[in-house]
Amino acid sequence: MTCRSGEKADNASMKNILIAYAGALLLLIVADGLWLGLLMPQQYEDWIGPLMRESPLLLPAAAFYLLYPVGVVTFAVLPALTLESWQRSASLGALLGLIAYGTYDLSNLATLKGWPWQLTLVDMVWGAVLTAAAACAGFFAVRVWGQRND
């Protein structure tokens, strides 16, 4: 979007931020649920079974899923909306996911005995892909349902 002055319009209204958050959150929950619940549970069990709980603790899991989209929107969606570029949203999301998941996985690899390097690699790639997709979901949610300033 371009304003009459030729400058890019600010798409960071509270409504757009909440729409982007909802889009990113929904994608994160669905995609990570499929990843952890259907596609990879046996692999995680094989890699880190003794470290896993019978059932995850809901409060820390909820805290993660409520907080992470804040970072996705702040660092990947809003800058991309300013440039009107879903590709920017995807690339910033991938970078954020690589850094965030890398922080967790590389720290575990460095400090925990028996932490598998294979899990580190797979999880970092998954973090990049998941976060890129969440950023795009937030971006396109704003494009479809958000306020436009033209």
Write out the residue ranges for each language-model feature:
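Short, Lys/Arg-enriched N-terminal segments with co-localized hydrophobic residues
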Residues: 1-13
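Juxtamembrane/disordered regions of integral membrane proteins
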Residues: 13-150
